[in-house]
Structures are given as structure tokens and as C-alpha cells.
Amino acid sequence: MARYFRRRKFCRFTAEGVQEIDYKDIATLKNYITESGKIVPSRITGTRAKYQRQLRRAIKRARYLSLLPYTDRHQ
């Protein structure tokens, strides 16, 4: 039987040496929200707690300033 090994999760922000997550960096923030607009949890992405809090704050600020949508497009 073949075993499938999951790739080890790692924090991208720690690896890149990011100090602060910016709410104006929409390209990065879009990687951490689902198609329906929900914030992806850290157990899925592997983000450390410190950066998950910064990510949450940045996404909420970007939503408030209409840089990111709160939900997906309704049809």
C-alpha cells in the first residue's frame, strides 16, 4: 500500500521575514480568503498565531475601505 504524506505546513510570513502585514497588499490578502469571502483558518494555511491576528486585522480593514468584498458576488 502506498502512503500519502501531507506536505508540512509552514508560515509564509515567518519564512519571508515579514514584520507587518499591510492591509493595502490585496494580492497577499486574497490568498487567505475563500471564494465566499471568509477568512481561511490558520490550521488550514499553517500561519502562526501572531501573523493570523495581523492577517485578520488587515482583511477587516481592507473590507471596511472597500478594497476587498465582504461576500462573493450574488447573482
Swiss-Prot record:
SUPFAM superfamilies: Ribosomal protein S18. Gene3D superfamilies: Ribosomal protein S18 (4.10.640.10). GO terms for cellular component: cytosolic small ribosomal subunit. It comes from the Bacteria. Coiled coil: none annotated. It holds the Pfam family Ribosomal_S18. GO terms for molecular function: small ribosomal subunit rRNA binding; structural constituent of ribosome. GO terms for biological process: translation. Transmembrane segments: none annotated. Keywords: Acetylation, Ribonucleoprotein, Ribosomal protein, RNA-binding, rRNA-binding. InterPro entries: Ribosomal_bS18, Ribosomal_bS18_CS, Ribosomal_bS18_sf. Binds as a heterodimer with protein bS6 to the central domain of the 16S rRNA, where it helps stabilize the platform of the 30S subunit. Part of the 30S ribosomal subunit. Forms a tight heterodimer with protein bS6. This is Small ribosomal subunit protein bS18.
